[in-house]
Swiss-Prot record:
Classification via PANTHER family: N-ACETYLGLUTAMATE SYNTHASE (PTHR23342), N-ACETYLGLUTAMATE SYNTHASE, MITOCHONDRIAL (PTHR23342:SF0)
A GO molecular-function annotation: acetylglutamate kinase activity
Family: Belongs to the acetylglutamate kinase family. ArgB subfamily.
A GO cellular-component term linked to this record: cytoplasm
Subcellular location: Cytoplasm
Gene: argB
Protein name: Acetylglutamate kinase
Reaction(s) catalysed (UniProt annotation): N-acetyl-L-glutamate + ATP = N-acetyl-L-glutamyl 5-phosphate + ADP
């Protein structure tokens, strides 16, 4: 498609999305490749300049693991789930809030736009409870494992986000929550993004990842559009598996609770965020009712 055709195709979408709220979950290789992250941030800033209200939520699992190893603490996983003891949580907060969040805010500032970095602790944005012990398969047996300071979101108070958006800031949210006794908890970033989108009555939720979207069983074709019932059937049939399941489950919950559409997009490809939102076919998977 010619560049001028892309621009003309974008116009009605820009008009339709003006004033709408979009929650973007930053994840995948973009979190460890500075050039990819810079491109994604520029695209997010463009959305702000064309009139959308943008909220960014980021993860940071690989960076947390690297920092732990650098500090001589070996990360512990059981059945693919991280064990988060108090020291691990302290390191996670250091990485998520002190490094990644600040870095994203700085990139946004370099693009000439104002941003504020917060975590779920701020303004009681994310209230959570400690996750119950999980049954996971270890070898050939099932074990019940206490994951430590890992939380499940119980409540979202979006007031702090509304205040920032009203003042034309881009909020950048680190996935740390607080429980009702004041203890900090690590939260899955996909879940945090979905819950924030629901609380804000966002128009769109976009999950940026390392894959092109939801693929067919042969991994040769991307489903550009899926209804909730289709996605549920594909999970049940095993077509959707592995790490895509929690991402899609967050998207599905958002759509069930009022978000007009949720998208899974490969954030490693240049300007995919814009192409997904502003072209007819898109480049990832869009999930709707």
């Amino acid at each position: 498609m010619k560049r001028e055709d892309v621009l003309m195709e974008a116009l009605p979408y820009i008009q339709k999305f003006y004033g709408k709220t979009i929650v973007i979950k930053l994840g995948g290789h973009a979190m460890v490749d500075q050039s990819i992250l810079e491109t994604v941030i520029r695209d997010a800033v463009l959305l702000r300049y064309v009139g959308m209200k943008v909220v960014l939520v980021h993860g940071g699992g690989p960076e947390i693991t690297a920092k732990m190893q650098a500090m001589g603490k070996e990360p512990k996983f059981v059945g693919g789930l991280r064990i988060t003891d108090p020291e691990t949580l302290e390191i996670a907060q250091m990485v998520l809030v002190g490094k990644i969040n600040d870095g994203i805010v700085s990139l946004i500032a370099n693009c000439g736009t104002r941003a504020v970095g917060i975590s779920g602790n701020d303004g009681n944005l994310l209230i959570a409870r400690k996750m119950d012990p999980q049954r996971v398969q270890v070898g050939e047996v099932m074990q019940e494992v206490d994951l430590g300071q890992v939380g499940e979101i119980e409540e979202v108070d979006p007031e702090v986000l509304h205040c920032l958006l009203a003042q034309n800031y881009i909020p950048v949210v680190a996935p740390i929550a607080i429980d009702r006794q004041g203890m900090s908890l690590n939260i899955n970033a996909d879940t945090a993004a979905a819950e924030i989108a629901i609380a804000l009555s966002a128009f769109k939720l976009v999950n940026l990842t390392d894959v092109d979207g939801v693929m067919d069983a042969d991994r040769t074709m991307v489903y550009h559009r899926l209804a909730l019932t289709e996605a549920e059937a594909m999970i049940g049939a095993g077509v959707i598996a592995g790490g895509m399941i929690p991402k899609l489950e967050g998207c599905m919950k958002a759509v069930r609770n009022g978000v007009a559409s949720a998208h899974v997009v490969n954030g490693n490809r240049e300007h995919n965020l814009l192409l997904e939102l502003f072209t007819d076919q898109g480049v990832g998977t869009m999930l709707t009712l």
